[in-house]
Swiss-Prot record:
One GO cellular component, as annotated: cytosolic large ribosomal subunit
Taxon lineage: Bacteria, Pseudomonadati, Pseudomonadota, Gammaproteobacteria, Enterobacterales
HAMAP family named among the record's database cross-references: Ribosomal_uL6_B (MF_01365_B)
Protein purpose: This protein binds to the 23S rRNA, and is important in its secondary structure. It is located near the subunit interface in the base of the L7/L12 stalk, and near the tRNA binding site of the peptidyltransferase center.
Name under which the protein is recorded: Large ribosomal subunit protein uL6
Length: 177
């Protein structure tokens, strides 16, 4: 059995938490995040900490409480420090550029690919082959990174494509004659 839910989430100074039934809003220097929690979870806010437990009558109460604790901990980290995700473009002529809140990608297609960034996500290009995504919402950062990677996933023979900075692409050997 996981004991994730038994640990409280400590709320640092400068973070404001509002609990309205099952809807929780966390506000900090990097923005404001809102999430609706499962009905099986009971959240208590006291002494600059959030504690979690199951409600009576729900079989999966502890599992849902552990999930809620992990999600809210990520929200607190997001509004205080924020999250970053780095992408690399590997391939001849593969380039990225940022214009406002649009990521412009040249990925070997006959046309450039423009990807509109959602609100709350910022992107920068330290070089033409790198993209750094920043934001407070961990799930949204991962989704945007996955969307950008999906335009040209790393292929298994040369490794060309869009990859996460920490991703290891396994390459295959070419067919022998």
């Amino acid at each position: 059995m996981s004991r994730v839910a038994k640990a409280p989430v400590v709320i640092p100074a400068g973070v404001d938490v509002k609990l309205n039934g099952q809807v929780i809003t966390i506000k900090g220097k990097n923005g404001e995040l809102t999430r609706t929690l499962n009905d099986a979870v009971e959240v208590k806010h006291a002494d600059n900490a959030l504690t979690f437990g199951p409600r009576d009558g729900y079989a999966d109460g502890w599992a849902q409480a552990g999930t809620a604790r992990a999600l809210l901990n990520s929200m607190v980290i997001g509004v205080t420090e924020g999250f970053t995700k780095k992408l690399q473009l590997v391939g001849v002529g593969y380039r990225a550029a940022i214009k406002g809140n649009v990521v412009n990608l040249s990925l070997g297609f006959s046309h450039p690919v423009d990807h509109q960034l959602p609100a709350g996500i910022t992107a920068e290009c330290p070089s033409q082959t790198e993209i750094v995504l920043k934001g407070a919402d961990k799930q949204l950062i991962g989704q945007v990174a996955a969307d950008l990677r999906a335009y040209r996933r790393p292929e298994p023979y040369k490794g060309k494509g869009v990859r996460y900075a920490d991703e290891v692409v396994r390459t295959k050997e070419a067919k022998k004659k």
